Amino acid sequence: MRLFYYKTINNHNILWFKRVIEQKPNNHYNYFVMEKILISACLVGDNVKYNGGNNKSPLIDKLLEKYELIPFCPEVEGGLPTPRHPSERRGDSVINDIDEDVTDNFYRGAELAFNICLYLKIKKVILKEKSPSCGSKIIYDGSFSHKEIPGMGVTAEYLKEKGIEVYSEDDIDSLL
């Protein structure tokens, strides 16, 4: 197990948080020089999805051999609870299924993700496809009818605009 402490600054507030993830470095040298990747927390098995579940990827162990993974959920870190109402993007806004505007939470999470990337010098992120925050190629159309459309989630779009390489779980093989 590996304990991480990170500090990020957002609107003059300092946020400290810790994450515990299992690391299996090949040797001590690699342990300290592995490239860091910010990854959707649900992909490493954290129960942060809107319904309280996760989307653990079977390729996480392979990624851990090559990268130091920094789990992060922009929706939770942006202030939304788990579980929570499902949300979908409508233009620049994000609305949940009971018609509440949760846009501010999504943009706050995106800014925190970028601050972590800056602080830790992270150049790549792996995000959950179809998510209103993390989708990198496909999102839902905002009608809650499960209709998929080309588009990006708030965090994916924000990070890409800031020069961070954005991948989805479908792209993990290209990183191995």
Where do the model's predicted regions map?
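Divalent-metal-activated hydrolytic enzyme cores
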Residues: E77, S87-L112, I116, K147-L176
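Short, well-ordered beta-to-alpha junction loops that form the rim of enzyme active sites
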Residues: C42, K128-S131, D171
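Polybasic, lysine-rich low-complexity intrinsically disordered segments
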Residues: T8, K24-N26
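Short, surface-exposed acidic-centric catalytic microdomains
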Residues: N55-N96
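Extreme N-terminal starter segment of soluble prokaryotic enzymes
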Residues: M34-I37
